[in-house]
Amino acid sequence: MKFEAVVRTEQGKGASRRLRHAGKFPAIVYGGTEAPVSIELIHFDVINQMDKPEFYEAIELVIDGATVKVKPQDVQRHAFKPKVEHMDFIRI
């Protein structure tokens, strides 16, 4: 499973809200020897794959051309809408 991601340039609550209104959501990739990286993902692409078991095993994220193997560590969902608010990924 592979997803395209873009490094986030803006941080904070306002920037995250603008992402969500644009059909994206913020995420972070951490672990290993590299520094944590804030990214943005397209909500529609991810939410359609989340009900598959292989989503929680290993994912390839293409972050600005570099491929990183990750595993979802934490998912924050909206209280009553079927939306993802934020995700944490750990490098494997």
UniProtKB/Swiss-Prot annotation:
InterPro entries: Rbsml_bL25/Gln-tRNA_synth_N (IPR020056), Ribosomal_bL25/Gln-tRNA_synth (IPR011035), Ribosomal_bL25_short (IPR020055), Ribosomal_L25_dom (IPR029751), Ribosomal_uL5_bac-type (IPR020930). It holds the Pfam family Ribosomal_L25p. One of its GO terms (biological process) is translation. Keywords: Ribonucleoprotein, Ribosomal protein, RNA-binding, rRNA-binding. Gene3D superfamilies: Ribosomal Protein L25, Chain P. The keyword rRNA-binding applies. CDD domains: Ribosomal_L25_TL5_CTC. SUPFAM superfamilies: Ribosomal protein L25-like. The keyword rRNA-binding applies. GO terms for cellular component: cytosolic large ribosomal subunit. GO terms for molecular function: 5S rRNA binding; structural constituent of ribosome. Part of the 50S ribosomal subunit; part of the 5S rRNA/L5/L18/L25 subcomplex. Contacts the 5S rRNA. Binds to the 5S rRNA independently of L5 and L18. Belongs to the bacterial ribosomal protein bL25 family. PANTHER family: RIBOSOMAL PROTEIN L25/GLN-TRNA SYNTHETASE, ANTI-CODON-BINDING DOMAIN-CONTAINING PROTEIN, RIBOSOMAL PROTEIN L25_GLN-TRNA SYNTHETASE, ANTI-CODON-BINDING DOMAIN-CONTAINING PROTEIN. This is one of the proteins that binds to the 5S RNA in the ribosome where it forms part of the central protuberance. This is Large ribosomal subunit protein bL25. It comes from Aliivibrio salmonicida (strain LFI1238).
